[in-house]
């Protein structure tokens, strides 16, 4: 009986007929989340949060634990897939004006910040060379905060340098934060269904809706199956495509890698950080690169919701996507010309999108009135 009620609930859930494939990434994110929690749980059974044993425990999982190589690779590749889906999900929200559902957008941005924190803590856990140095560089940014910076850094490290207490608390945080993500995801979905999802036209779709099941459930299942297939193919043939070669060596505090860089999904924020020569300025720009998303619902001035009918904003949006990719690329390069200049120009363009959003909206309204 409860099973029938759940099916009936999905069957009665009205959804716009014209929502495209870009709306499937929410369910894909939910799948990624479930997969990460399951693989993470099994990996935590074999992991040892100790600076002398952490690296060896990962090697033990991959070599000795039955199907451990699959769990470890699923967890690592799953994180990359998670962020690919997240960035597409955010881009869809920006393009189609989903941010006008303010509560859903603000909870989603908070989710993104929590996800990035969780991924950062997880990257430190293998205690490889790049894990150690990336953690040192990023956590050291806290010292840029006036008055409180040094105290906060010492508190986070659990001492005067990154050591055993740091790894222990990072493991604890990496384990507990996903449960916070699940809770906030539930709130995110509830807030979304209070108003209902938007559609590519940005219009009210009350007059033309279909049941969620079977139409959108099968569509979701197809996209989820495709995503899992891509992940399994990656794990089978190119499992180390996203790994840094430096991270296959155990952490050595006495040897600094030639280029310190985090995982690829943080490179755009890291590129913005590096483009500013001042430490405090760089730390603020790093924080702003994500938190600026919180301003979008409050700077929308256009009469139309979606960018489907807004050619100027379409140009701005695709410029944003291009700058995102260029910043990611420059962050992998050494801090020298021409990369520093490219990084500074693209970082300026990145923030320009959010600052010019209200002006472009106002201009479009003026043009529309003139045409009428």
From Swiss-Prot:
One of its GO terms (biological process) is mitochondrial electron transport, ubiquinol to cytochrome c. The lineage of its organism: Eukaryota, Metazoa, Chordata, Craniata, Vertebrata. Its cofactor is heme b. InterPro entries: Cyt_b/b6_C (IPR005798), Cyt_b/b6_C_sf (IPR036150), Cyt_b/b6_N (IPR005797), Cytb/b6-like_sf (IPR027387), Cytochrome_b (IPR030689), Cytochrome_b_C_euk/bac (IPR048260), Cytochrome_b_N_euk/bac (IPR048259), Di-haem_cyt_TM (IPR016174). Belongs to the cytochrome b family. GO terms for cellular component: mitochondrial inner membrane; respiratory chain complex III. Binds 2 heme b groups non-covalently. The cytochrome bc1 complex contains 3 respiratory subunits (MT-CYB, CYC1 and UQCRFS1), 2 core proteins (UQCRC1 and UQCRC2) and probably 6 low-molecular weight proteins. Heme 1 (or BL or b562) is low-potential and absorbs at about 562 nm, and heme 2 (or BH or b566) is high-potential and absorbs at about 566 nm. Its main location: mitochondrion. Heme b b562 binds at residues 75, 174. It comes from Acrantophis dumerili (Dumeril's ground boa). It is found in: Mitochondrion inner membrane. The keyword Membrane applies. It comes from the Eukaryota. Keywords: Electron transport, Heme, Iron, Membrane, Metal-binding, Mitochondrion, Mitochondrion inner membrane, Respiratory chain, Transmembrane, Transmembrane helix, Transport, Ubiquinone. It is a multi-pass membrane protein. Component of the ubiquinol-cytochrome c reductase complex (complex III or cytochrome b-c1 complex) that is part of the mitochondrial respiratory chain. The b-c1 complex mediates electron transfer from ubiquinol to cytochrome c. Contributes to the generation of a proton gradient across the mitochondrial membrane that is then used for ATP synthesis. This is Cytochrome b. Heme b b566 binds at residues 89, 188.
